[in-house]
UniProtKB/Swiss-Prot annotation:
Domain of life: Bacteria
Protein family per UniProt: Belongs to the glycosyl hydrolase 3 family. NagZ subfamily.
Name of the coding gene: nagZ
Binding site for substrate: 62, 70, 133, 163-164
This protein's UniProt keywords: Cell cycle, Cell division, Cell shape, Cell wall biogenesis/degradation, Cytoplasm, Glycosidase, Hydrolase, Peptidoglycan synthesis
Name this protein carries in UniProt: Beta-hexosaminidase
Entry annotation: catalytic residues: 176, 248
Transmembrane residue ranges: none
Length: 340
C-alpha cells in the first residue's frame, strides 16, 4: 500500500489515469463533485478505479453534509453539523446525528466508497473554512454530537476521520487560500480545541485524523499538517493515537510554505503523516510519485469499509426512508433559518 492519495479528472478514467493508479506509491483516491453525474456512473467509476489500481486503494470523499457534500442529486441532502444542536437541541439532535452518520456512511458504502472524511471536530463557527461545519462552540457539546455521528458511521461499517487536528475553529483565515495563524495561548488550544480529539482518541472512536493547515506559533512554527511536534510528539506520543494520519490537501495555498510538491509530500511523511493528499494538480501528483522515496503505508489498510449491499437494497429499507426524510427536512429548515 503506497502513501499517496490523488484524484481523477472526470466521469471515467483516461489512459494516463489508469497508468498513474497502477503506480506502487498510490494507495488512495479521493472523489470530487466533478466525478459525479449519477449513481450508476459513480458506481462504474469506482469499479474502474479498483480495476486499474495495483494496490487495494482506499477510496474517499468529502460527504460530511451541509456545504461540503460532493454527491447531492440522487443522495440524501445532509444537513450542516451545526444544525443538529441549533435546531433540535442536544437530545433530539444527538439521536438524529447518529442516524445521519449511519445514513451518510451507508450511502457511500453502497457505492463501494471506503471513507468520507468526517466528522469535523473543530469548535466554533467564526472560521471562514469551518463555520457551520462545526457541531458547536462549546467543546463538550461538540464532543457529544460528534460521538453520536461517529457511532452511526461505525454501525454502518465505515471508519472515521476526525478533522482538523488540533482545531481549526478559531481562525478566521481560510487555509485553502492562505496559511492561517492561531496566536492563542497554548493552554487554550490544548484545553479548549484539542479536548474533543483527546476524548475521542481515549475512547478509541477515531480511526484516522486529518491535521489542520494552521500554524500555532505559541507551540510550533510549522503548520500542524507538517509538524513533527503536533503529529509525533502530541498526537502519537502524548495522546497515544495509533490510527491513520492524513495530510490535508498539499495543493492548498496553506501548504505552499513547505516548498515544491515533492518537498511538501516528503515533509508531511517525515513529520508523521501516513498518507498524503495531492488533489487538483496532476503535475504536482506526478512529481510526488516520481520523487518520493519508496514507502509503505500499512496503517491505511485498516480503513476499508465493511459490508456489501446495493443502493437499491439500502433505499428499500424502512430505516433509510425514515432517516432520509428527517435529514432532508432538517437541511431545509437550516437553510431557511440562515436566510431569515
Amino acid at each position: 500500500m503506497g502513501p499517496v492519495m490523488l484524484d481523477v479528472e472526470g466521469y471515467e478514467l483516461d489512459a494516463e489515469e489508469r497508468e498513474i493508479l497502477a503506480h506502487p506509491l498510490v494507495g488512495g483516491l479521493i472523489l470530487f463533485t466533478r466525478n459525479y453525474h449519477d449513481p450508476a456512473q459513480l458506481r462504474e467509476l469506482v469499479r474502474q478505479i479498483r480495476d486499474a489500481s495495483r494496490n487495494h486503494l482506499v477510496v474517499a470523499v468529502d460527504q460530511e453534509g451541509g456545504r461540503v457534500q460532493r454527491f447531492r442529486e440522487g443522495f440524501t441532502r445532509l444537513p450542516a453539523a451545526q444544525s443538529f444542536a441549533a435546531l433540535l437541541g442536544m437530545e433530539e439532535g444527538g439521536k438524529l446525528a447518529a442516524e445521519a452518520g449511519w445514513l451518510m456512511a451507508s450511502e457511500m458504502i453502497a457505492m463501494d466508497i471506503d471513507i468520507s472524511f468526517a466528522p469535523v471536530l473543530d469548535v466554533g463557527h467564526i472560521s471562514a473554512a469551518i463555520g457551520e461545519r462545526s457541531y458547536h462552540e462549546d467543546p463538550q457539546k461538540a464532543l457529544t454530537m460528534a460521538r453520536h455521528f461517529i457511532d452511526g458511521m461505525h454501525a454502518a461499517g465505515m471508519k472515521t476521520t476526525g478533522k482538523h487536528f488540533p482545531g481549526h475553529g478559531a481562525v478566521t483565515a481560510d487555509s485553502h487560500k492562505e496559511t492561517p495563524f492561531d496566536p492563542r495561548p497554548a493552554s487554550v488550544i490544548r484545553d479548549h480545541d484539542m479536548a474533543v480529539f483527546k476524548s475521542l482518541i481515549a475512547e478509541q472512536r477515531l480511526d484516522a485524523i486529518m491535521p489542520a493547515h494552521v500554524i500555532y506559533p505559541e507551540l510550533d512554527p510549522r503548520p500542524a499538517s507538517g509538524s513533527a511536534y503536533w503529529l509525533k510528539t502530541v498526537l502519537r506520543g502524548e495522546l497515544g493515537f495509533d490510527g491513520v494520519i492524513f495530510s490535508d490537501d498539499l495543493s492548498m495555498e496553506g501548504a505552499a510554505i513547505m516548498g515544491s510538491y515533492a518537498e511538501r509530500g516528503q515533509a508531511s511523511l517525515d513529520a508523521g503523516c501516513d498518507m498524503i493528499l495531492v488533489c487538483n494538480n496532476r503535475k504536482g501528483a506526478v512529481s510526488v510519485l516520481d520523487n518520493l522515496s519508496p514507502i509503505k503505508a500499512e496503517r491505511v489498510t485498516k480503513l476499508y469499509h465493511k459490508g456489501s449491499f446495493s443502493r437499491q437494497e439500502l433505499r428499500d429499507s424502512a430505516r433509510w426512508k425514515t432517516v432520509s426524510a428527517q435529514l432532508e427536512q432538517l437541511h431545509a429548515r437550516w437553510q431557511e433559518a440562515k436566510s431569515a
